[in-house]
Amino acid sequence: MRKFDKSIAAFEEAQDLMPGGVNSPVRAFKSVGMNPLFMERGKGSKVYDIDGNEYIDYVLSWGPLIHGHANDRVVEALKAVAERGTSFGAPTEIENKLAKLVIERVPSIEIVRMVNSGTEATMSALRLARGYTGRNKILKFIGCYHGHGDSLLIKAGSGVATLGLPDSPGVPEGVAKNTITVAYNDLESVKYAFEQFGDDIACVIVEPVAGNMGVVPPQPGFLEGLREVTEQNGALLIFDEVMTGFRVAYNCGQGYYGVTPDLTCLGKVIGGGLPVGAYGGKAEIMRQVAPSGPIYQAGTLSGNPLAMAAGYETLVQLTPESYVEFERKAEMLEAGLRKAAEKHGIPHHINRAGSMIGIFFTDEPVINYDAAKSSNLQFFAAYYREMVEQGVFLPPSQFEGLFLSTVHSDADIEATIAAAEIAMSKLKA
């Protein structure tokens, strides 16, 4: 049995200092029934907690570390920038360099604005969509997470396509009424919503691959249908690629699926592990953002040289060949997990998009949030705890996916499959 004495003590102290002892809720490990692991360091595909335990890491800071921990080029770039100054409140050339890379690789982006988080990116994109179209309502999908902006912390009302209800205390009902929620992968509900509210829908915001109900790819024709419906009704299509951007493909989710939105939100990978976000799109739309246009958005540390340098060094190391290797390694892990579950007769469904993998402990195909909720959460929690014992660090939630990096080796994947085999053999009874 591994020992976690130092993590337990650190969490006890943290609970007097921060809400729930953490700075983001999922880090409390509540849904898996254990104390959080306090990490000390990471290198490559491994992380090490403060008790000295080593893990193969599939969290990767929730996706940004596509080259693993402490990538040499990223670390050297950060050292060089920090020695010259961490932020100036004035433009720097590294902003241009990262912006050029983003524009070259993301089909929808002609102009990009850097911000400090994915939440900032989505909030700003919604304001831009409303300002550009002169409309008030947005349409989002149940179970898709777009950050913690008030307009996006909305749950479904009753009926097929309804005005939303607040999903957190502190979100005014008046804000919620401008958000329409429908089921992910349900194009007919989207069409119905436009029949009811079309003249006032500014945009549809969607993750090309839903990543916060586990990993749920789009059904064939779904993204294409959204593109068609929004164009027909004069609404903008926004892809939230904070998670999928440069993760599922060289040209992001939109390149992977061949559908080009009007606006795209980015984060995670483009910061190389530092706080970052971005939104961009057609020049005609983006020129409405201040100071070139009337739609306001600003940020003290937006485009700061540390994040820009880390992002630039991260992206320049990604090539089309990187994603060929991602596919090979992800297929290997997916097949191994499936074989282990089948061997022990454990109900399961595995979804994958590029280097994102989600395993659900259910017999039901998972194409939306309702299906994801059919998973056996108690089994997942037990599986999670056993995988920790076997030295594998997974996201501590059934509704989060695994991420691969360029530095995960075949040996890492083989060890992970072996760990899953042991875990499932212990839990099958």
Swiss-Prot record:
Cell compartment(s), UniProt: Cytoplasm
Highest taxon in the source lineage: Bacteria
PTM annotation (N6-(pyridoxal phosphate)lysine): residues: 268
Entry annotated with the keyword Cell cycle: no
Enzyme class: isomerase
Catalytic activity: (S)-4-amino-5-oxopentanoate = 5-aminolevulinate
Pfam families: Aminotran_3 (PF00202)
Keyword Ribosomal protein belongs to the record: no
EC number(s) reported in the record: 5.4.3.8
Cellular-component GO terms for this entry: cytoplasm
UniProt entry keywords in alphabetical sequence: Cytoplasm, Isomerase, Porphyrin biosynthesis, Pyridoxal phosphate
Stated family: Belongs to the class-III pyridoxal-phosphate-dependent aminotransferase family. HemL subfamily.
Name of this protein: Glutamate-1-semialdehyde 2,1-aminomutase 2
